[in-house]
UniProtKB/Swiss-Prot annotation:
Lineage: Eukaryota, Metazoa, Chordata, Craniata, Vertebrata
Annotated protein name in UniProt: Tryptophyllin-1
Expression tissues: Expressed by the skin glands.
Primary location class: secreted
Cell compartment(s), UniProt: Secreted
Superkingdom of this protein's organism: Eukaryota
Length: 7
């Protein structure tokens, strides 16, 4: 995903 911790 757009956020590293929200892959």
């Amino acid at each position: 995903g757009p956020i590293p911790w929200q892959r």
